[in-house]
Design a protein with these regions (language model features):
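Generic, well-ordered alpha-helical segments
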Residues: 51-53, 65, 77
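Short, charged beta-turn/beta-strand-edge "cap" motif at the junction between a beta-strand
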Residues: 62-69
Length: 134
């Protein structure tokens, strides 16, 4: 694999090349790596198993010390592939509070932010495709 990111590169069995692909990917491609499982209700409704996280989505934390808590996504860090969730904060030694960032695999989307018309259109398109298959 070349030094820069290449869209024509398919895959490799070597973990170092897989890590390099993810690290060198442009931000619009890294957004796809932030996919998170949907809740059972959303899965049935839209016929999709997972979607990329967005600011405004409500997520349930499935792993770690904050397990079981549900809140809105405050920010999405594409460079580090991390997500900050409302109210999930740690207190630093000086007393200031800092957001705790989560990896997307530790979350589950409970409600979607449907402000974006393109996102709604994509969901409806997938929904109609699944109905045609059945």
């Amino acid at each position: 694999m070349k030094q820069e990111f290449s869209t024509s590169w398919i895959s490799s069995t070597q973990p170092r090349k897989q890590r390099k692909f993810i690290a060198n990917a442009p931000l619009h491609t890294k957004h796809r790596f932030l996919s998170t499982n949907l809740s059972k209700e959303l899965r049935q409704k839209y016929g999709k198993r997972n979607l990329p996280l967005r600011k405004g989505d409500e997520a349930l934390i499935m792993r770690g010390t904050f397990r079981g808590k549900k809140a809105k996504v405050v920010s999405v860090d594409l460079r580090n592939s991390r997500v900050a969730i409302e109210g999930m904060q740690r207190t630093k030694k000086d007393g200031s509070k800092v957001n705790v960032f989560f990896r997307p695999f530790a979350l589950q989307i409970q409600t979607l932010n449907l402000d974006d018309k393109q996102r709604v259109a994509a969901l409806n398109r997938k929904q109609s495709e699944n109905k045609e298959k059945k």
